[in-house]
UniProtKB/Swiss-Prot annotation:
InterPro entries: Capsid_VP1_Polyomavir (IPR000662), dsDNA_vir_gr_I_capsid (IPR011222), Polyomavir_VP1_sf (IPR036931)
Protein name, UniProt field: Major capsid protein VP1
Cellular component annotations (GO), alphabetically ordered: host cell nucleus; T=7 icosahedral viral capsid
Subcellular location: Virion; Host nucleus
Length: 357
C-alpha cells in the first residue's frame, strides 16, 4: 500500500507578545541565573507580639483590654496593643565585585506559610470563664491574619478608628493624629522597620506601594466569632507578579512580617485578652541577573560614612570658623594678609583686601 503524503499544514500562529519587563522594585531586570546552586530555601518563624513580653506568664497574650469612657480620653496601654512581628533575614552574599554593570540578586519566588498552634484552641480545662460546671470558654472573637514577604521593608499606611486616641510611648503612632487619619491620608506613611512596635489597629499595608513586596491578609469580626483556621504543608503561594518577577532582595536581605490574632481569652471576671499564635515560613529564592542599581560613588560614600561611629552632638554646620590645610611649599607671597582658601567644591578662591579710607 503506497504511503500517503502529508498534507501541508496551515502556518502556525505567531506567539502572542507580552510587555517586556524592564524595571521591577526599582531594579532593572535582565535575566535568570541557572545552575545547580541557583536555588536556595530559607525556613523561619515569627512569634506573636500581642503586648506581653516573653518573661510574662501570659506570653502570647495581651494584657486585659480596657475601654475608654470618652472618645477624647482614649489612652490604651502598650501591653494591650497587638503589634506586627517583623524580621530581617541575611542571605548569602552573591557579589564580590559591586562595580560591574550587572550583578546577581536573590529573588523570592514562593512561600509556604501557616499558623502554628491552632491545636491549643481546643483547650477548655484551663482557668477561664465558665458557666456552672461546663468547660471553660475556648478562644473566640475577632480574627486578623496577615503575612508579608519583601525584598525591602514593607510600606505601611497609617489609618485609625479614633484620631483622638493617645497612643503610649514605645509604639509607632502619630502624635497628635490629624482628623484625616480616620480616612486615607497619603502623607501618613512609614516602613515596617521594627518588631512589636507597630500597632495592628493603626497600620495597614500600603496598596499604592510595595511593588517589591507581597502581602496577604484576612479579617473576621465579632466578640464571639468562632475561629476557623486551616493548616497544610501542601499549599505554595507564588510570589511572582504578572511579569514573572518576585521580590528582589536588596542588599542580600529578605524581610518578612506577620500578625495572627486568633481571638480573645475570656477571664473568669469577664476581662478579655488578645490571643496570638506564631507563623512559620518556608521561602524559595533564586538568583536573578540585574543591572547594577548601586553607583560606585554611592558605595564609596557609604563605606567611608559607616567607618566612623554615629555621634549625636551639637550642630556644627554654622560653628566652624576656619580650617587650614597645607600641602607642599611655595614662594613667599608678597601680601601676607591676602586671604586664600578652597571652597566646599575644592576650587581655590582669593579674597583681595579692600582698603578703606
Amino acid at each position: 500500500m503506497p504511503l500517503k503524503k502529508r498534507s501541508a499544514s496551515a502556518p502556525r500562529k505567531t506567539p502572542q507578545e507580552v510587555p517586556r519587563l524592564l524595571i521591577s522594585g526599582g531594579v532593572e531586570v535582565l535575566g535568570l541565573k541557572t545552575g545547580p546552586d541557583s536555588i536556595t530555601e530559607v525556613e523561619a518563624f515569627l512569634n506573636p507580639r500581642m503586648g506581653l513580653e516573653n518573661t510574662d506568664n501570659h506570653y502570647g497574650y495581651s494584657e486585659n483590654v480596657t475601654v475608654a469612657k470618652k472618645k477624647d480620653d482614649d489612652k490604651p496601654l502598650k501591653n494591650q496593643l497587638p503589634c506586627y512581628s517583623v524580621a530581617k533575614i541575611e542571605l548569602p552574599m552573591l557579589n564580590e565585585d559591586l562595580t560591574n554593570d550587572t550583578i546577581l540578586m536573590w529573588e523570592c519566588i514562593s512561600v509556604k506559610t501557616e499558623v502554628v498552634g491552632i491545636n491549643t484552641l481546643v483547650n477548655t480545662h484551663s482557668y477561664g470563664k465558665r458557666d456552672g460546671e461546663s468547660p471553660s470558654m475556648p478562644i473566640v472573637g475577632l480574627n486578623y491574619h496577615f503575612f508579608a514577604v519583601g525584598g525591602e521593608p514593607i510600606e505601611m499606611q497609617y489609618i485609625v478608628q479614633n484620631f483622638q486616641c493617645d497612643y503610649p510611648v514605645g509604639v509607632v503612632a502619630m502624635k497628635p493624629s490629624p482628623l484625616s487619619t480616620q480616612v486615607l491620608d497619603p502623607k501618613q506613611k512609614s516602613k515596617l522597620t521594627g518588631d512589636g512596635i507597630f500597632p495592628i489597629e493603626c497600620w495597614a499595608p500600603d496598596p499604592s506601594k510595595n511593588e517589591n513586596a507581597r502581602y496577604f491578609a484576612t479579617y473576621t469580626g465579632g466578640l464571639n466569632t468562632p475561629p476557623v483556621l486551616n493548616i497544610t504543608n501542601t499549599v505554595t503561594t507564588i510570589l511572582l507578579n504578572e511579569n514573572g518577577v518576585g521580590p528582589l532582595c536588596k542588599g542580600d536581605q529578605l524581610h518578612i512580617a506577620a500578625a495572627d490574632i486568633c481571638g480573645f481569652h475570656i477571664e473568669e471576671d469577664n476581662k478579655y485578652k488578645y490571643r496570638g499564635l506564631p507563623r512559620y515560613f518556608k521561602l524559595v529564592l533564586r538568583k536573578r541577573v540585574v543591572k547594577n542599581p548601586y553607583p560606585v560613588s554611592t558605595l564609596l560614600n557609604t563605606l567611608f560614612t559607616q567607618m566612623s561611629p554615629n555621634v549625636q552632638g551639637q550642630d556644627m554646620t554654622k560653628q566652624v570658623e576656619e580650617v587650614k590645610i597645607y600641602e607642599g611649599t611655595e614662594k613667599l607671597p608678597g601680601d601676607p594678609d591676602m586671604i586664600r582658601f578652597r571652597n566646599q567644591f575644592g576650587q581655590e578662591e582669593t579674597v583681595i583686601p579692600v582698603i578703606t579710607n
